[in-house]
Amino acid sequence: MVLHSKMSKVMKGQWAEFTAAAWLITKGYLIYPKHQDNDPIDLVAVHRNTGRTLKIDVKSVSIRASGRRKGDRINRVPSDAQKKICVKLLYVYKDGRCDWNGKN
């Protein structure tokens, strides 16, 4: 995405959440967005056919700009509060790709 570098951190986060929601919709999920800031969950997704429910924290992928690991994805880990309630991290790349492990 060309404009991605000109976005503020908040705008990048919002873009990633909308992109993740669109991706999940294509996978058959109904999306329920968050309604408050600083929530450990960004989206709740419920599969239309199976009823599988996911609690998701969306992360935009960041790449290391320097150092010996330059070019590597910066690893994100769920907070203790997120681990307690089984929140999954969903990674969103600048090109709009999404994945669960952030390694593609």
Model regions and ranges:
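Catalytic cores of nucleic-acid endonucleases
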Residues: 7-14, 18, 23-34, 38, ...
